[in-house]
A protein has these predicted regions:
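Non-catalytic macromolecular-recognition regions in eukaryotic signaling proteins
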Residues: 1-179
Length: 179
């Protein structure tokens, strides 16, 4: 996880880096990549969009078409402090915290037509029915923080993977009031 000094109410997730899979993965990661392709019915792609020697020019590194190794079906964030009257300490902030990111999932579902990357944006209590899949990037954001809710919060962030696995992270974060 990383915090953004330019947006203090933003949490970026790069902790997935150890669970990242691509067509050029090796060994066990290559096998997991193949499993993910079958799981997402992503087995018919038949064209190269960029030459391997040009891959570094896309995003400045060779991580162009890599995805995180988890599909999320539920996310929750809980604070040890009151957020507002409707969100006392210890209750879900699901209708307050937004998720965002980029995904290849819609591209695969469309049969590889249109833009390969879809933008994700929504509240964490309203994740799409088929989950958050084939993520290229992912973040959480507190878009509206009142003066009363600003300050240091000890957050518990829960991710539920589609196989039922729960990933729990604890983070101390200073939330600044929205403008």
């Amino acid at each position: 996880m990383k915090l953004n000094p330019n947006n203090p109410n933003f949490i970026g997730f790069d902790w997935f880096a150890g669970d990242e899979y691509a067509y050029d993965s090796k060994g066990e990661n290559k096998e997991r990549y193949k499993e993910l392709c079958v799981k997402h019915n992503d087995t018919n792609y038949d064209r190269r969009e960029i030459k391997p020697e040009d891959a570094l020019g896309i995003n400045g590194d060779a991580r162009y078409r890599r995805v995180f190794g988890h599909d999320f079906v539920e996310i929750d964030v809980i604070s040890d402090r009151d957020f507002d009257d409707a969100h006392p300490a210890g209750t879900s902030l699901g209708d307050v915290v937004k998720y965002g990111g980029k995904s290849y999932w819609e591209y695969v579902k469309r049969g590889y037509t249109g833009n390969p990357v879809s933008e994700l944006d929504g509240y964490i209590n309203n994740i799409p029915e088929d989950g958050l899949c084939l993520l290229k990037s992912f973040w959480l954001n507190f878009p509206e923080v009142s003066v009363e809710a600003s300050g240091t919060h000890n957050l518990q962030i829960l991710f539920v993977v589609d196989d039922g696995t729960e990933l729990v992270f604890n983070l101390t974060m200073y939330l600044e009031p929205s403008n």
